[in-house]
Amino acid sequence: MYKRQDVDGIGIVRQNHTGLPTRIVRSHWNLGPTLDFDPARAARNIALGYLDTMRLFGRVGGTAYAILPDQDGFLAHFAETYQRILEQVNDRAPGMDRVERAARQRAGYPKPFAPNPSAPTRGALAPLELACERLHVPEDLSYTPKLLAATFLGSFDKDPADRFPALLDGKEGSLVAERAMAAAVPEEFVTALVSRALAETPLL
């Protein structure tokens, strides 16, 4: 198997004349300027390249983060809870499911698995990854789904879900204003959904 790293740069791109099947490793992350040899960035990019290669060959999962096997069924519980909360929000404010899909699309994450949105797939994991990316959870490490969730919960002081009390809890408030805010910054809405879902998903 012939592997090539897909890095933006200036110069000549050599064609693969080996006759071997080629798989191109693409990173979800911004790797920074090609000719800026900052040691910390270089170390990060080397780690990301390794993890991206492991993902390409099926050793880890995920879209942006390197996700290790889920040994205790945590992801299935999270996905089921997340989907239930999203459906409740959509009942209060029809169309919020489209906002959630827009967040996935804008950030480069897959759609939910259509036959079963709560199935423990890359699509089910995507909201958690998206929320972690938004809150700058380190991307050059590998995580189990549960560890990624715990790291996310430890990355903020003020709960992101507090920004959407009318949508998430049906509390008195401006549903119109919250819908507008969610539509303007759908990633923030998904982050709030993830926080609320994790609050209802046991980590221990």
Residue map of PLM features:
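Patatin-like phospholipase
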Residues: 3-204
